[in-house]
Amino acid sequence: DCCGVKLEMCHPCLCDNSCKKSGK
């Protein structure tokens, strides 16, 4: 799990804009 989304969706796993847009 990465920032609320699966690792596959958030490769960087930095909880940044990309992660927040895909997850929470």
Curated annotation (Swiss-Prot):
Positions carrying Lysine amide are: 24
Cysteine pairs forming cystine bridges in this chain are 2-10, 3-15, 13-19
Q: Which GO terms describe its cellular component?
A: extracellular region
Keyword Lipid metabolism set for record: no
Q: Name one GO molecular function term.
A: toxin activity
Subcellular location field: Secreted
Domain of life of the organism in this record? Answer: Eukaryota
The UniProt keyword set, sorted, is: Amidation, Disulfide bond, Ion channel impairing toxin, Neurotoxin, Secreted, Toxin
- Tell me which tissues or organs this protein is expressed in: Expressed by the venom duct.
Q: What family does the Swiss-Prot or TrEMBL record give for this protein?
A: Belongs to the conotoxin A superfamily.
Comment field on protein domains: The cysteine framework is IV (CC-C-C-C-C).
Q: What does this protein do?
A: Probable neurotoxin with ion channel inhibitor activity. In vivo, elicits dose-dependently excitatory activity upon injection into fish. Its action is slowly reversible.
Q: What is this protein called?
A: Conotoxin PIVF
User: Which species is this record about?
Assistant: Conus purpurascens (Purple cone)
